[in-house]
Amino acid sequence: MTGPDARPPPLAEQVLERGHEMRTTLARAAAMLPLRPDEQAAETFMELPPARILRYPAANAGSAMAPVLIIYSMINRPYLLDLQPRRSVIRQLMQAGADVYVLDWGEPAALDRDLDMEECIGEFVRTAVSAIRAAHDGSRLNVAGICQGGTMAVCHAALHPESVQSLANFAGPVDFHTPDNTLWRL
C-alpha cells in the first residue's frame, strides 16, 4: 500500500514503536545521571598544603565590595557552591562585585589525619585571611563558613575580629556543650 494514508507493515510499526520507547527511556535515564559541576574557572591564589586558596575574581574589576572568603568543610567538596551557571553561589557573589576566595582542603589523605582544629584555624585560616587582606590593602573580609568550615570561621572571627567585616555560618556547629556532649563525641 502506498500514498499518504498508507500504514507501515506490522513489523515496521513494532520497530518504530520500540525505537520511540527506547528514546523515551534513554531521556529519562539521562535526566537521572549525577550532576557534573560546571565550575567557574578559578586561579590558585595560594598553596597551603594540603589546602589551597582558590580565587574567583569579581565580574567588575575595581568593585568596592569587600572580598569574600568561603571556608569549606574538610570532607566536602567546594564545587557544590558552583554546580551550574544559574545555580552558583560563587558566580552570584562575583556578579555582585566580590572577589571570592575558597579555602579548599583537597582530598583527605592519610597525612591529614593528625590535623586538629587548632592547627586548621590558627595556621590555615589565619594565613589565608592574612594573605587575602594583604592583597586587598588590608580590607576586612566577609567570611562564610560551611559545615565544619562554619565552626572554623566562628572561631577565627572570635580570635581576630579586626579581620572580619561580616560572618555567615552555614550549618556549622558552635555549641559543644549539649546535655550529652553529642557533638563532642563526633
Name the predicted role of every residue range.
Residues 1-186:
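N-terminal cap/leader regions of alpha/beta-hydrolase-fold enzymes
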